[in-house]
Amino acid sequence: MSTRFGGTRGKVLAVAALAAIVASTFSGSVSAVAGGHDGDQARPDHWGVITRNTIGSPVADLRNGPFGSFGVTGPSASPPYGQGSLGIEVADESTSLNPGSEKVDFGNEVDFYGDPVQGLRRVGFHVFQTGENVAYGGDENMPNIRFEIDPNLTGLNDNYSTMVWVPDASPVTNRWSGFIDATTSGYWFLTGNEVPICNQAAECSLEELRTALNDGGQGATILSAAVGKGRDHMWIGAVDGLRINQTIYDFETSGVRTRRAG
């Protein structure tokens, strides 16, 4: 009797262990879990540090908060969505390269791939800016939104450039900002001089950049989308509520949630 019981018990334990492994595997494959409100969508989470666009030892980490700074109350005292955000830390003069500053992109190389640049209509984010960051690099020492693209320009044998949004100064420091609209503030430029009228020395609006890329060819397509910082000044802060068209990307410690924009 005891032998039979021991054998049965062993089989039960083995089945339970196998079930736990399967459950763990499937729960780990989807970290952007719907919260059951505000139109959250459950989907595979393809967000993370884009390693080939990273220099030095920067930090881009899904974190709780920031909450504050101390003494700050009301909506600006916590992330605009949920409890978390994307924490970013980059240093200057910290590598053996020239310049010596760090760079990081936290982005998605899957879900936007092949989307038309002409379809970008609403872009922006919320930022937690600090007075220290302003001291490090001035009022406009801010993170960026970057889209790697294939310009597909007629007569130009080049299939790579990066669209970069440079925000204006944050309207507040040491607390969360409201939504900063990348279609009406700051400026955009293209790397690589694909469109000279929208390079880093010739600032463009998003509308002007889209128009410059619309030269009658196949049309520019997106390769990746990211929030990043560098290479310029030290910056330690956070971003949340990245908006791309009608989707808001809510950065949480458990992953990146998607919400429908109102």
Regions found by a protein language model. Give the residues of each.
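Short carbohydrate-recognition loop motifs
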Residues: 71-105
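A carbohydrate-recognition surface predominantly in extracellular/luminal proteins
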Residues: 39-49, 118-130
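Solvent-exposed strand-to-loop "edge" motifs in beta-rich extracellular domains
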Residues: 87-91, 126-140, 150
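Extracellular glycan-recognition surfaces and repeat-rich motifs
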Residues: 36-84
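Secretory targeting and sorting signals
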Residues: 1-34
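Acidic, glycine-anchored loop motifs typical of Ca2+
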Residues: 153-158
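Extracellular/lumenal carbohydrate-interaction signature centered on repeated Trp-anchored short motifs
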Residues: 108-123, 213-216
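Extracellular beta-strand ligand-recognition surfaces/modules
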Residues: 139-149, 176-258
